[in-house]
Amino acid sequence: MHNKIVRIASSALTGGKLLEKLKPLTRWEVQWDPNKTKCLGITREVTFKDYETTWAFLTRVSMRSHLWGHHPLIHTSYTWVKLELHTHDIDPKDGAHSQLSDIDVRMAKRIDSYIDEMTT
């Protein structure tokens, strides 16, 4: 089996579209700019039951990230994981760099599904 890497183009989320896309991501913390006008990204922390489950989860996230060409920032220590999602390469016409994009939301939903499967 061959997995083809497909880099998904991203577009910044702003205004009403941003708020609409954030609604289902209730387990993610929103990171705002100092003026609270731009979403800079989202973070989520999770603790797994053991080391093996933690790394099984991280493997799934890394494989999906690689396939989509969009990689979260990951911090981990034994059973604890913190994920940060934001997009660096948004076209400047869409606003400041490093903000939330549609691909971040898509990745967050996929990560949520992995967490749900591995913590129940």
Swiss-Prot record:
Molecular functions (GO terms): 4-alpha-hydroxytetrahydrobiopterin dehydratase activity
Any single biological process term in GO: tetrahydrobiopterin biosynthetic process
GO cellular component, as recorded: mitochondrion
Transmembrane segments: none
Statement: the UniProt record of this protein carries the keyword Ribosomal protein: no
Catalytic activity: (4aS,6R)-4a-hydroxy-L-erythro-5,6,7,8-tetrahydrobiopterin = (6R)-L-erythro-6,7-dihydrobiopterin + H2O
Enzyme class: lyase
EC numbers on record: 4.2.1.96
InterPro entries: PCD_sf, Pterin_deHydtase
Pfam (any one): Pterin_4a
Keywords: Lyase
Note: Present with 752 molecules/cell in log phase SD medium.
PANTHER family (UniProt xref): PTERIN-4-ALPHA-CARBINOLAMINE DEHYDRATASE (PTHR12599:SF0)
Family: Belongs to the pterin-4-alpha-carbinolamine dehydratase family.
Name of the protein this chain belongs to: Putative pterin-4-alpha-carbinolamine dehydratase
